[in-house]
């Protein structure tokens, strides 16, 4: 049996105290504890703590090398030696092996060595985007902690706005009804944020 947490989730960072309580709960109920840490490095930057500290309470952790870090593809699974041995066997049985993957591995190593600290830039750009959107009419913005911005837009304005943004080469995903998700990443600059804000202002006018 397994208890699985995600950090970050919806762009929000789980507090360290919450992780400690999850570990205690898992121990009390005989559960393994896994972290979907696709964006654990965003959480680490936001908290100002090493990712190892965030991962410590967990039996296993997954980490994405493409989200935020900018590698073309790839994830890492971390756990005990016995756990990884089992995971490799399951991967082989399910056809998850890959040949000649050295180039992809090299890209992942480059991302880990060069793109972690710069995640702070993504967080800053997300904050800039959120502040600019909050100044517009017909839109409400959730508090931002990392690189995700969630904005609630008036129903009557949303379809036309999304069409306008798409024509401007800005992709905003409808998330839940009138809520839109915007994510900053390695390919987004502060200039791009200004361009996006101008497009939102035009689309909501």
What feature does the model see in each segment?
Residues 1-155, 159-168, 172-188, 196-204:
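Conserved PLP-enzyme active-site core in the AAT-like
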């Amino acid at each position: 049996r397994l208890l699985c947490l995600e950090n970050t989730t919806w762009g929000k960072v789980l507090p360290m105290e919450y992780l400690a309580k999850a570990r205690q709960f898992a121990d009390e109920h005989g559960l393994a504890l896994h972290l979907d840490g696709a964006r654990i490095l965003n959480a680490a930057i936001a908290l100002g703590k090493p990712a190892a500290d965030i991962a410590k309470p967990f039996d296993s952790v997954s980490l994405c090398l493409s989200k935020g870090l900018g590698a073309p593809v790839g994830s890492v699974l971390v756990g005990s030696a016995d756990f990884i041995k089992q995971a490799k066997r399951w991967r082989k049985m399910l056809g998850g092996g890959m040949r000649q993957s050295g180039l992809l591995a090299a890209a992942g190593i480059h991302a880990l060595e060069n793109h972690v600290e710069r995640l702070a830039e993504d967080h800053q750009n997300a904050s800039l985007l959120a502040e600019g959107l909050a100044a517009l009419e017909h839109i409400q913005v959730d508090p931002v902690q990392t690189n995700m911005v969630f904005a609630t837009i008036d129903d009557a304005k949303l379809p036309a706005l999304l069409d306008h943004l798409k024509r401007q080469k800005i992709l905003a995903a409808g998330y839940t009804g009138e809520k839109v998700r915007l994510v900053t990443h390695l390919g987004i600059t502060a200039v791009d944020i200004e361009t996006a804000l101008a497009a939102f202002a035009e689309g909501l006018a």
